[in-house]
Amino acid sequence: MKRIVLLMAVFAAVAVQLRAQTIATFNFHRLGSIEIELFDDKPITVSNFLKYAASGRFENQIIHRWVPGFVIQGGGYRVNTSDPQQYEIERVQIFGTITNETRVGTFRSNTFGTIAMARVGNETNSASSQWFINLDDDNGRPVAEGGSNLDNASGGYTVFGRVISNANVLNLFVPPPPVNGIHIREDIIPLSPMAVLTTNELSWNDLVYVDLSFRREMNLQATRNIRGIRQIAWSSVAGVTNSVDYSANLTNWVNFTNVVGTGAQMQFTDSSTDAQRFYRVKLLY
């Protein structure tokens, strides 16, 4: 089981309303990074995306499809570097397909800077590992209105996050090549049209790799009453074991409890009267 420590903090008071959110950093090789907020009200889709990342199946993934001004797409192919003498491009091994959540929770349109799940043809519930980022505000609109109808075609393409910083990096993919030093290769089947960073002989360093990292803003907070009893509260992550630890020195951590998150605020009482304690919440995937 992979353990991911997503936040560690102590605050002075407990808020009434706490909201968790996962922030994903997408680092595009040689181009820059963007941050995307993942939407908790698309729980199946977000959990699926995080599962691929935590399992290592997204390691060395590449942008295998680029349509300028429309989408960039990843999650389908990666570079296997297990043999240093012979790298090879291989398909990302999938866990299976997931339920379409286009209209679960808040409906969000496929507009510039949103991330959505790719699917197989017209099969509504066929998304697995592949994702795409929209490069046009009109992608979700009907074709008759000048859009690509991604919001409605065969149940729609589930939007599960949006860019919150460094959108200028996405703008590099909007104009057609050779602007911004990104080029298209259409002779590497089935990775066509594929984004590359050279017009010369292609090397492994010229692919557009995407490295992912995550942080969870869980609003972990603590307060102490007049008897010295501490109350710890945080925005839990639904369907995942939330592990609460404490430490007196930020070095040696002791587990308090493990609970399955509900997606709502959770609380835990620490009856210790130690002068100082730090707390953290880990997610056990």
Sequence positions of predicted segments:
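Sec-dependent N-terminal signal peptides
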Residues: 4-14
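Residues that line or immediately flank small-molecule/substrate-binding pockets and catalytic motifs
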Residues: 8, 65, 260
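Preference for short coil/turn "hinge" residues that link or interrupt alpha-helices
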Residues: 11, 51, 56, 91, ...
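Cross-family detector of peptidyl-prolyl cis-trans isomerase
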Residues: 18-221, 227, 275, 285
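Short, composition-biased motifs enriched in small/polar/acidic residues
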Residues: 213-285
